[in-house]
């Protein structure tokens, strides 16, 4: 069938951004399936969680829509927000129109006003922008920290960048002892891995999302050999 969604890849140091086709199968059997697995893993690690007694604050990118071709292109996060099942809207802040806005300053203000009076139990988004949003919410609400504003907040799901440079600031903004952090590796090309055990920082490679993996033996690669290894022949604990 015809592809109607294209996620803008961040590219690499040596290449420009690419537009990755997102099929219906990719949405359902990779990204959405991964989201369900991620939450299931969290609940397994924290069985006393009250995550679903509140709402999730989701911060994503923007989306361009072509009325003629009915195509969508933009950040993967925006495509996912736009394609979530209808029932997700009952548990999500902000509303979809605000979530997909392009003008970031106005977008952050609107999200802040919508979120500060809600019972927020989880956060999702890139750390750099999430920090800006949380600080803006504190400025508007007058609360001394995020835990005072949202006492039931317990989870931040993050990915896309190294979290270590941001961790101290998050702990200062959210001093709650029950706060948990869950890392994932979700790329435009597919959902790769998720932090499956706490407090371990390692991420579990997800193998049943329709992604074909190839690997390199680093010792041989350093010698100029570039033969790939398929998943079946991977040796554990070997670089």
Q: Locations of the language-model features?
A:
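Conserved structural elements of the adenylate-forming
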Residues: 22-45
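Conserved AMP-binding loop of ANL adenylate-forming enzymes
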Residues: 40-86
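Short secondary-structure capping/junction motifs at helix and strand boundaries
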Residues: 17-20, 40-54, 121, 178-182
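Active-site glycine/GP-rich loop and adjacent strand/helix microenvironment
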Residues: 1, 79-239
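Short, solvent-exposed loop/turn and secondary-structure capping segments
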Residues: 20-21, 69, 135
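General structural concept
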Residues: 1-9, 25, 30
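Conserved adenylation A10 loop of the ANL superfamily
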Residues: 6-20
